[in-house]
Swiss-Prot record:
Name of this protein: ATP synthase subunit a
Pfam families: ATP-synt_A
Native species: Paracoccus denitrificans (strain Pd 1222)
HAMAP family with a match to the protein in the record: ATP_synth_a_bact (MF_01393)
InterPro entries documented for this protein: ATP_synth_F0_asu, ATP_synth_F0_asu_AS, ATP_synth_F0_asu_bact/mt, F0_ATP_A_sf
Keyword set, alphabetical order: ATP synthesis, Cell inner membrane, Cell membrane, CF(0), Hydrogen ion transport, Ion transport, Membrane, Transmembrane, Transmembrane helix, Transport
Family indicated by similarity: Belongs to the ATPase A chain family.
Length: 248
């Protein structure tokens, strides 16, 4: 945090993560329109616009919008097929939606005066719990009691199998925790560092260095936004594979 006593200005790197109502100053309830819901809606709108306008023409020689849409589609489709196999492709629409939402929410959060929904554990936890609940239900529907074979390491010595089963069970229920914290933590940390460098830009003596640092951090954050969307999605595919093929 940097303070400018004369002007009474206070810069705090965590102020950008405060959820505020869009209208008025009242308390935030579950039904209150907030800056978080606004930017999530904008992310959904941007995804819809890209996929609608990018696939509408279906030109043999694609334009830039169509190229981006086809690149995203092809990358996620290959990811799902490589990790889960052919039988996992029926769940591709959900995985594609998840990847695009996280990616666009991350990128929109880099705009000045914007808000990054994926920096909040409340948002990422909902995404992670939906994945966890979905693959768990799918595992039992597809495999019945055989889904429990995911926790029984048959290749291990018999004496160690009960211990490993407990460890596997604990690690399974920790999945949504690590899945959500990883995304929120990385996005929040990067945005906070950019805010810190921006605060130092107000000090004339170090302003040039601060501007260079902000530029470098923005470049790094673009990469982090892409990587975190990819990591969240590929872990979803791994969990989906466990539900479809639970045997160790």
């Amino acid at each position: 945090m940097a303070e400018e006593e004369a002007g009474g200005l206070v810069f705090h790197p965590m102020d950008q993560f405060v959820i505020k109502p869009l209208f008025g100053e009242g308390p935030v309830n579950w039904y209150t329109p907030t800056n978080a819901t606004l930017w999530m809606a904008l992310a959904a709108l941007a995804i819809t616009a890209l996929l609608v306008f990018g696939t509408r023409g279906r030109a043999i020689v694609p334009n830039r919008v169509q190229s981006i849409a086809e690149l995203l589609y092809g990358m996620v489709h290959k990811m799902v097929e490589d990790v889960t196999g052919k039988d996992g492709l029926k769940y591709f629409p959900y995985v594609m939606t998840l990847f695009c939402f996280i990616l666009f929410a991350n990128f929109l959060g880099l705009l000045p005066k914007s808000f990054s929904p994926t920096s909040h554990i409340a948002v990422t936890a909902v995404l992670a719990v939906l994945v966890f609940a979905g693959v768990t239900v799918l595992g039992f529907v597809k495999n019945g009691a055989h889904f429990l074979g995911l926790f029984w390491v048959s290749s291990a010595p018999l004496a160690l199998r009960p211990v490993l089963a407990v460890i596997e069970l604990i690690s399974y229920f920790v999945r949504p925790v690590s899945h959500s914290i990883r995304l929120a933590g990385n996005i929040m940390a990067g945005h906070a560092v950019i805010k810190v460098f921006a605060a130092f830009a107000a000090v004339a003596a170090i302003a040039p260095v601060s501007v260079v640092a902000i530029t470098a951090m923005y470049g790094l954050e673009v990469l982090v936004c892409l990587i975190q969307a990819y990591v969240f999605t590929i872990l979803t595919c791994v969990y989906l594979k466990d539900a479809l093929h639970p045997a160790h």
